[in-house]
Amino acid sequence: MRSAIIKEGPERAANRSLLKATGVTDAEMKRPFIAVVNSWNDIIPGHIHLNKLAEAVKAGIRNAGGVPFEFHTIGVCDGIAMGHEGMKYSLPSREVIEDTIELMVRAHQFDGMVLIPTCDKIVPGHLMAAGRLDIPAIVVTGGPMLPGYVDDKYTDLISVFEGVGAFRAGKLSEAELERLENLSCAGAGSCAGMFTANTMACMTEALGLSLPGCATAHAVDAKKVRIAKESGERIVELVKQNITPRKIVTYKSFENAIMVDMAVGGSTNTTLHLPALAHEFGLELPLEAFDELSRKTPHLISLRPGGPNFMLHFDRAGGVEAVMQRLSSKLHLDQLTVNGKTIGENISELEIINPKLNEEIIKTLENPIHAEGGIAVLKGSLAPDGSVVKQAAVDPKMRVHTGPAKVYDCEEDAMKSILAGEVKPGDIVVIRYEGPKGGPGMREMLAATAAIAGMGLLESVALVTDGRFSGGTRGPCIGHVSPEASEGGPIGLVKDGDLIEINIPERILNLKVSEEELEKRRSVFNPPEKKVTGYLARYQRAVHSANTGGIVD
């Protein structure tokens, strides 16, 4: 056992003395020491229940003969951080979370770990730590929130964000907006659609790092507590067998995850998190892999924000394993998972509890919602190194569009203009200097995109940015434009009125300005320098481009 280095032999008497001060007995000294890495806190709805899941995990560890030690990581709620300076700290928190887990685990020489995250950057931070440390690990994602129910229809956080735009457009009264505010977020769990947190939970299960059914088991469901307890039991077996994450996750596992991502219409943030995760596993996952697999993998389930269904429906229809059943002819079925079985074995054992809903919600390869997957990678003179769009959430009318640019150098300026009615049908909103270095922190533009949606402009206005989007964004919103403006990318050269060409089927994002004119602009181009201090200053110096996953050296 790894933990022998802190607890065996006469020279470790002082170490044992400190462990005994915490209540560890002599008998427990002989058992595996398991870290329970909990991201519980009081401010993130997706995390307010994780203390209860941690107790279930610890009970499972004890049942199996291990000794649990719980510690906590930080977490940022992207929804609360949205639309202001706080969002600059969301993506950078991913690496901080990873680093703190590494520090705790290496310092205390745990034999294995159970990771308990829920929300957007916290799940990838935990996964990246698993890849870097490569000790036996299993992930228990916290589970989705139940949807709200207002005016005889299901609602979620995006309903509220879009309600702000509708209110500003005079389509919603203040009382109606307040009703949405009060009733749309039902309690514990990650926001109720296929947004970033739930997408990453699905990626975790598809990679084989959580038990079957974990991704869609809801936060308030007793099934989630049972999965947590079973995960605690299972980690002790993984330690005994020395099955580590790098023995489970291979390049083929990432291909499986991307195919699931495409089938469920997942968040564009996977194009940041999966390459960064692959990097920690010693693998290279290029942006082009997403587009290649998207062309081969149809979109099979229509979930919020791009469709009418919620995670609740997805879970009842069979969840991730049910989608993998549909994709079985395309997947690498021989890939191992943390329960000791292969993907193929797991999906062959899946019992569909609600067959009618399963058929209704999860389409077949022969009869998909869209022939291609949820995400497309666009390139061209505006994005030489690539950009991404959630094509599953784009109205067919806007998949091919050319329009004049309205340029803003930060999200706040764009938001004011949108809410003031200055953005007109046909316009392409350009928000720049919001990339990993330029922000710094690569903020999500959900407030702006939700305002566009709420004001009824989804079918006539596009948005292009070197920032990124919430998993809740819908419409012709193209992000991760690389190189970013602060790195001298062409997006920094765009002027009001320039024509921009968007062609999603052809994967094109072009700035319709002559090379001669661009050279003139480039010769006098001087990106503004943003003075930042503290962690953001260190992050700005070390972060790489979005097309590499925004990894940090």
UniProtKB/Swiss-Prot annotation:
EC number: 4.2.1.9
List of residues that carry N6-carboxylysine: 121
Keywords: 2Fe-2S, Amino-acid biosynthesis, Branched-chain amino acid biosynthesis, Iron, Iron-sulfur, Lyase, Magnesium, Metal-binding
Domain of life: Archaea
Residues bound to [2Fe-2S] cluster: 119, 191
One cellular component term from this protein's GO annotations in UniProt: cytosol
PROSITE patterns: ILVD_EDD_1, ILVD_EDD_2
Active site: 470 (proton acceptor)
Needed cofactors: [2Fe-2S] cluster; Mg(2+)
InterPro entries: Dihydro-acid_dehy_C, DihydroxyA_deHydtase, DiOHA_6PGluconate_deHydtase_CS, ILV_EDD_C, ILV_EDD_N, IlvD/EDD_N
Reaction catalysis annotation: (2R)-2,3-dihydroxy-3-methylbutanoate = 3-methyl-2-oxobutanoate + H2O; (2R,3R)-2,3-dihydroxy-3-methylpentanoate = (S)-3-methyl-2-oxopentanoate + H2O
Function: Functions in the biosynthesis of branched-chain amino acids. Catalyzes the dehydration of (2R,3R)-2,3-dihydroxy-3-methylpentanoate (2,3-dihydroxy-3-methylvalerate) into 2-oxo-3-methylpentanoate (2-oxo-3-methylvalerate) and of (2R)-2,3-dihydroxy-3-methylbutanoate (2,3-dihydroxyisovalerate) into 2-oxo-3-methylbutanoate (2-oxoisovalerate), the penultimate precursor to L-isoleucine and L-valine, respectively.
Family in the record: Belongs to the IlvD/Edd family.
Protein name (Swiss-Prot/TrEMBL): Dihydroxy-acid dehydratase
Origin species: Methanosarcina mazei (strain ATCC BAA-159 / DSM 3647 / Goe1 / Go1 / JCM 11833 / OCM 88)
Biological classification of the source: Archaea, Methanobacteriati, Methanobacteriota, Stenosarchaea group, Methanomicrobia
